[in-house]
């Protein structure tokens, strides 16, 4: 390259001294000739040498207006992978514009076809069937009983009033009741609604996970204290003056801080932020209010009509229409899911963390870059992932289980809670959620085996976009048949 560049520069100087046979050259040719003449020495062996000023011969060449004899060089097209070009910002903007226009058309089509269906007052009926009966809020308040019971057991274990075996038995009974009691109320009390049931069961599920962690951490502290006592050591309190040590953590203040903190894993000393940022908190609260209204509006205006129109194809088993309705439902469902993710994991959890000065704000990672199903499940819900690793996966490994069996165990637990939170509020057990979660195991193997890089990322997005509407249609269809067609047939 250096020899060729130098030769080109020499040839231009030689031709520049000849009289022109073509008359005056255009300004573009003259500018190209000056640029190449100046760039010639930079392409030599001393590539870092500064470009010299144009020589007198080059100036003469510009004045005489010679055409450049060479205008091509070795290079790849921009879309070729070898070109090294990666600035596709304009194409990304084009995709965003096309997405906005496409959804605007769908929005106008929906308004023309159905009119305005958004009714904020109707949302109240989703939580309360009878204005004089509030079973869901009562269940949430009753959850305090289980938290106090776990606290009292730990207090007695700390002073030796209970043996570890008796404490374990009481904790198991308490944790089992946390899951069974609200489920029994939901199945037996007619005045509770599916949405109210879902919220109550979610509160009890979160309480179950938190108290499970609370019990484990206090047990580890007792074992560490007993080990230190048997070795003749005494815990040093001067090392960290502002930290809490066991059993000083066993207070109601500490317990309820943990219960309201945006985490499922208990610690004696949580990282704390120095102050409450009022502007940050205000932005998060405004986001919570805005996205709540947006989700309700999209569900009422977009999803509900699509689901209602999907019942007849399911009843007639018209597979082509079922696929068409599935794809039509995929867009609003996925959009609402993305909004829900931002609303919950960024707006809500950050607002709670800011109020409580909770320092660990890693509620999610870059799951949108997932190139495998496993990476997605490890990064989209960090509080649950940390709990599974700390209190389920690693304990199974310590007990001698293989990594493969531990992973299956984690997915089994996740599948159980997914089915618990769907089937019990709907009062029907179809195991679609359980099957969908367990199907993630072979799906993770398949995607990891046959798809890599961008293809793996596309496969993950495809499962998210298509998989969820399938489960939604399955449950809605069965719920519709069970609650609307069956009573009519019986009548």
From Swiss-Prot:
Any GO BP: diacylglycerol metabolic process
Domain of life (superkingdom): Eukaryota
Keyword Glycoprotein: no
Region ranges (Disordered): 1-60
Membrane topology summary: Multi-pass membrane protein
Positions of region (Intracellular loop 2 (IL2)): 357-402
Annotated metabolic or biological route of this protein: Lipid metabolism; glycerolipid metabolism
Site, Important for catalytic activity: residue positions: 419
Region (Amphipathic helix (AH)): 383-397
Catalytic activity, as annotated: an acyl-CoA + a 1,2-diacyl-sn-glycerol = a triacyl-sn-glycerol + CoA; all-trans-retinol + an acyl-CoA = an all-trans-retinyl ester + CoA; 2-(9Z-octadecenoyl)-glycerol + (9Z)-octadecenoyl-CoA = 1,2-di-(9Z-octadecenoyl)-sn-glycerol + CoA; 1,2-di-(9Z-octadecenoyl)-sn-glycerol + (9Z)-octadecenoyl-CoA = 1,2,3-tri-(9Z-octadecenoyl)-glycerol + CoA
Region of interest: Involved in homomerization: 1-94
Record topological domains on the Lumenal side: 122-133, 188-194, 312-318, 424-431, 485-491
Coiled coil: none
Function as written in the Swiss-Prot or TrEMBL entry: Catalyzes the terminal and only committed step in triacylglycerol synthesis by using diacylglycerol and fatty acyl CoA as substrates. Highly expressed in epithelial cells of the small intestine and its activity is essential for the absorption of dietary fats. In liver, plays a role in esterifying exogenous fatty acids to glycerol, and is required to synthesize fat for storage. Also present in female mammary glands, where it produces fat in the milk. May be involved in VLDL (very low density lipoprotein) assembly. In contrast to DGAT2 it is not essential for survival.
UniProt protein name: Diacylglycerol O-acyltransferase 1
Source taxonomy: Eukaryota, Metazoa, Chordata, Craniata, Vertebrata
